[in-house]
From Swiss-Prot:
Family listed: Belongs to the IF-1 family.
Task performed by this protein: One of the essential components for the initiation of protein synthesis. Stabilizes the binding of IF-2 and IF-3 on the 30S subunit to which N-formylmethionyl-tRNA(fMet) subsequently binds. Helps modulate mRNA selection, yielding the 30S pre-initiation complex (PIC). Upon addition of the 50S ribosomal subunit IF-1, IF-2 and IF-3 are released leaving the mature 70S translation initiation complex.
Protein name: Translation initiation factor IF-1 2
Species of the source: Symbiobacterium thermophilum (strain DSM 24528 / JCM 14929 / IAM 14863 / T)
Subunit and interaction comment: Component of the 30S ribosomal translation pre-initiation complex which assembles on the 30S ribosome in the order IF-2 and IF-3, IF-1 and N-formylmethionyl-tRNA(fMet); mRNA recruitment can occur at any time during PIC assembly.
Primary localisation category: cytoplasm
Length: 72
């Protein structure tokens, strides 16, 4: 899957789950399961409930995603 195929959406972190997974609520009301991207993990960026984040979704599975950016 190339970089062009991903869907980027903004959302709000609702809860922390084990193994660096998060439940993220999208503006349309859907909730997705998201994990942290490698760059965020590498730079020790903390993600807490209530944070606004950008999530990349695959067009093949819209229930899972990757957190690629945390807004300040």
């Amino acid at each position: 899957m190339s970089k062009d195929d991903v869907i980027e959406v903004e959302g709000t972190v609702v809860e922390n789950l084990p193994n660096a997974m998060f439940r993220v609520e999208l503006p349309n009301g859907h909730r997705v399961l998201a994990h942290v991207s490698g760059k965020i993990r590498m730079h020790f960026i903390r993600i807490l409930p209530g944070d606004r984040v950008t999530v990349e979704l695959s067009p093949y599975d819209l229930t899972r995603g990757r957190i690629v950016y945390r807004y300040k």
